Curated annotation (Swiss-Prot):
Its EC number is 2.7.1.21. This is Thymidine kinase. The keyword Transferase applies. Substrate binds at F121, L166, I167, L168, A169, G170. Gene3D superfamilies: 3.30.60.20, P-loop containing nucleotide triphosphate hydrolases (3.40.50.300). Zn(2+) binds at C146, C149, C179, C182. It is an enzyme of class 2 (transferase). ATP binds at G17, P18, M19, F20, A21, G22, K23, T24.
Length: 185
């Protein structure tokens, strides 16, 4: 079934995976498809994500200026009215403690597309993802190759430093992804 058939009004789609797997690239692809269908899209970015001021992937792919409305917020409850919006796209969904708010938008017949990490650097699922998961109509897992051995599927996010803060935004300067074999080494 094609992706566009899965993105229906009133549905919640969730894309999970480790860092550097292409989740934001997938979201940009969805936005491009929705734009071709003349849907009004709102992209919500967490203020906890201090990595970039633009909507950009780790590989440098960016949303075009004015491609969709971009809202930066600490909580989804602060976003305000989305009455003229067809689709809500949320990157780094695990950053939003009130991610369950997406159910209300789905009840308003909006297309909801979420992307987030499969687990923290401690290999534990983020609670916002756990709470929204039962309400998702479609879930996609995107993997990547281990950054240590380049042989196996990496599903673990590993922090390079000893900082124990749960939310610490960063890229390859702070994190790598690795497979189960390399995690145990």
């Amino acid at each position: 079934m094609s992706l566009i058939r899965k993105l229906k009004p009133g549905t919640i789609s969730l894309v999970l995976g480790p860092m550097f797997a292409g989740k934001t690239t997938f979201l940009i692809h969805c936005i491009n498809m929705l734009e071709r269908l003349e849907k009004k899209v709102v992209f919500i970015k967490s203020t906890k994500n201090t990595r970039d001021k633009t909507i950009q992937t780790h590989s440098g792919i960016q949303l075009r200026p004015n491609q969709c409305k971009i809202i930066e917020s600490a909580q989804l409850s602060d976003v305000g009215s989305l009455t003229d919006t067809h689709a809500v796209v949320i990157d780094e969904a695990h950053f939003f403690d009130d991610l369950i708010r997406c159910r209300t938008w789905a009840d308003e017949k909006k297309i909801i597309i979420l992307a987030g990490l499969n687990a923290s650097f401690e290999q534990k699922m983020f609670q916002p993802i756990v709470r929204i998961f039962p309400y998702c109509n479609w879930v996609k897992y995107i993997g990547r190759t281990c950054m240590k051995c380049n042989r196996h599927n990496a599903c673990f996010n590993v922090r390079k430093n000893a900082d124990k803060t749960l939310i610490l935004a960063g890229g390859s300067e702070l994190y790598i992804t690795c497979c189960n074999n390399c995690l145990k080494k």
